[in-house]
Curated annotation (Swiss-Prot):
Residues 798-800 are annotated as: May provide specificity for triple-helical beta-glucan. Disulfide bonds: none annotated. It holds the Pfam family Glyco_hydro81C. Residues 431-524 are annotated as: alpha/beta subdomain. It comes from Arthroderma benhamiae (strain ATCC MYA-4681 / CBS 112371). Its main location: secreted. One of its GO terms (biological process) is polysaccharide catabolic process. This is Glucan endo-1,3-beta-D-glucosidase ARB_01444. Keywords: Carbohydrate metabolism, Cell wall, Cell wall biogenesis/degradation, Glycoprotein, Glycosidase, Hydrolase, Polysaccharide degradation, Secreted, Signal. Induction: Expression is down-regulated in presence of human keratinocytes. Glycans are attached at residues 159, 239, 259. It catalyses: Hydrolysis of (1->3)-beta-D-glucosidic linkages in (1->3)-beta-D-glucans. GO terms for cellular component: cell surface; extracellular region.
Amino acid sequence: MKPYTTLPGVAVLVSLLTQSAHAAPFPSRADVVHTREQESAARPQPIVYKHERGVSNEIQYLPPDPQGHPTIIPFPTHISYVTFNSRPGAIHPPYPHLDISEASFKAEDSTCWYRGKPCEGVPHIPIVKGFDSIEKRSPAPQRHPPAPTKATAGYQFTNCTSTSNPGPTATSPTSGIPSQPSAPPATMAGQDIFQPIAKDPIPANIKSRDDHPVKANHIENPTGPISTNKFYANFFLGNQTSTTFTHPYTMIWAKGDKNASSFGMAISHVEPSQRATGEPNNKLPGNPVRYYINPVGIKSLVLSASELKESTTMSVAKPQAFSAQAILRPTGGSSESITFPLVQGMGFITAIYNNLQPAIQSAVLFRKVEPAGSPQGGIFKYKITLEDDKNWLLYVIPENGADPKLKLEGNKLISGPTGFKGVIQVAKNPSAEEGEGIYDKSAGSYATDIKISGSVGTDGTGTYKFSFEKAGKGAPLVMYALPHHVESFDDATKNTKKNMKLSTTTKGMATACVGDSWTMVEGNLPLSMDFAPWKPGSSSQVTLSEGAKNAIKAVAGNELSQDMELQTNLNSMYFSGKGLNKFAGAIYTVQELVGDKAAASGPLNSLKESFKRFVDNKQQIPLVYDNVWKGVVSSGTYEKGDTGLDFGNTLYNDHHFHYGYFILTAAILGKLDPAWLDANKAYVNMLVRDSGNSVDNDEHFPFSRAFDWYHGHSWAKGLFESSDGKDQESTSEDTMYAYAIKMWGKTSGDKSMEARGNLMLGILARTLNNYFLMKNDNVNQPKNFIGNKVTGILFENKIDHTTYFGANLEYIQGIHMLPLLPNSAYTRSAEFVKEEWEAMFASGAAAPAEKVTGGWKGVLYANLAIIDPEASWKYFAQPSLDLSSIDGGASRIWYLAYAAGEYSTYIAL
């Protein structure tokens, strides 16, 4: 992967440093670190950081392979940039970057200064000379393995840090929204999936702390659990100046931005034609581009007030799973305010003014603003055309019903009456008169929240419903549905669709729907799926042949005799969980599928002891209960001050990955020994409540921390500000979590949890194949991108076909494969796997699997079992198998069983 790409006329940073990272599964140093001798002279060197804020230089995990050699080594992140082809420094992202100049450029002409000298193209955090609105700040600590203490390639520099001022804390009461709350949605037929998990107290051996590294300074009345991984988090994190993506709109606090000269709320909507793309990959069929990114910071409209100046504050109120409120005040504690209800999919951007003079601005510039009458009583409509030829509608609903008589002052400002109380709404209109008619009928109404209900029937059909809470005039709501919603609408909801669509940043076209609820249906849920290998459509459990059993017995002794404590008692919840689950799957295979209980007995007892260490909270880095945001987190950051320890666990990164492995391990332990459940059930339920709670009234944990029921998948990023929004890299570990709670629910007797896991798997099977796993006929991602087959890392604002730990194809594709589990063939369709294999890993393809080295090779061949179980079996059963190709979080025992389970004929050695 090239560390930079020059695009004429484009000044866009694509930096993986600013995002939440995902740990890789045990590649070796040689896989990811290139020396100068290995690189061609023409290829720019990767940038290696000597130290990154938030990334520990300690070796977090060194489990031995069967020969006793480490199978994971710390390695650097490959960094990628889109930079300038002229005038470096003219526009600066406030993150580490590399300016590439033309040969004729003079360093002294740069507006970027580094360490007191003009920028000469070195990687750095910019200190912008003469641009006060751009602040220096350090990248958010990210989830990738620690950087090596000695750089092995490329440039070296020490990262800078700065602490942003959190700003004043709002102390006045929350601005009220006149709501029309709906009754809790009625439970649908079948098993209710949102029943409370047993509400045990936090175990006494998990200490409570009130000093979380990230303060809730910008949240109003932060008393109960606060959602940490949701779409609006940028509004209360860092400088509060990164974008929030409501889909299809984007919102950003202007906060004195010089382009808009405003402290109001900026709104934009990006068309596909505005995207920037990366370089084509000529090694893949179709030469797909490596990434695409939507521009941020376009301020098509800004809803502000003349009173909003340098003293303006923004706070967030009522943060929920689907909604929140962003509140602007002229000064902290002021009763005058503008309140913005934030709800995923909202058709209007709504601003509720309380005694302020509206100032509606545009950095794109107004070409035409014309009054357009009153579509409803008390509503005043204006039609706006901007200089980019885009059409917007503006509706004013004064509390007193009087004509606001908005005035256009130049091409940047529309002013309203002083002391205005009422509602102003804006919406982009892509559909001319038809679009106007749709918006006109719903103007004055706005969503304030979404209530969700759901059930799963015994026939394998799951249903979930969004009931929109609203306020205002009472008209039916305009809400935008993503493609996976539209695909799964029931018949009644299909009738709410309108002939109006707006593009989203990374999920295709959103469809306008008019109504106060949606109901989605997922059929063919994997109710029969258990711990054994499983095939879609199968209603029975796999029985292994005698040949397969004998082959597994022959290798079981080596793996089950490994030092379990050494591989599970680690200073990382993530890697400890992977180690525990590795042994759990192997023990289950030997005891239940092979039928050798004697061989499994000793390792089973060892696994119980290893798990008990965590239940007793005596692992290397114990858990604590965070009493600020409300959750169970690693104590590492509290003790060492490094927010990147255990990949940001303390700041709620990736809890569904980390805790999912523990939950799945517990499900297997409880299956193998039901008596084990009594002493351990409360601990495991605590992990489920933290990462994926089923209710919103639990005093200890928020509802559904990771899984986003609107987007249909999880977000991995926690309390880190991010210019491109939330993101997720490993779809397969997302499905692992859903499978884990399904199986823990089954083992522990929680029917609601089991049903919820089944429905989550069904939703994931749909969303992953719409947005992440791209078959040739995918219509939601750009045609020039789908040849990559997987997204790599999907953000709310961009998609980059890479990983946080390297750009080898086996890394990028493989992180969407592991861990191989019974659910893998359900969410990774055979059609997709076949297309991906032929394009990437077949003999003669871009990266033939037979030439891959290390643990990724085993991941690829285990994945091959979905379409060619015979070839997969032969690879793992070969007597001369290179054991280093078995990932440290997997076992040969399970890989053999998985291939045999998918193989429909008798396996003879």
